């Protein structure tokens, strides 16, 4: 319905980005979808409803943990190629680790910066389908 209306209104979708959530289990679901299931359901939905002319889809983290959001993005990109670029537009999933490390204290600024850089680096790898959970532990060991 969205893209039908955009086409009817003569919107050039080649100049747009879609910013959705991923297909996730409900908050109260006892049976949680795994990483591959989330990736498959999300890509399937996008394939059915988003025209190939849309250049990119940038995901919200939608309340996921930092690492889950990264793992899901990675799994989607690993299933590619896709007609659109799949990337991230995370707020909390990028900022929360940095804010936790910083704690509002001047002496923790560098720790907050390192935490932010680490999350951005993990998501950059996921954007290319190159993320692995082991990368999280390697960074902690440094």
Where are these regions (language model features)?
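Active-site capping/gating regions of soluble enzymes
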Residues: 1-142
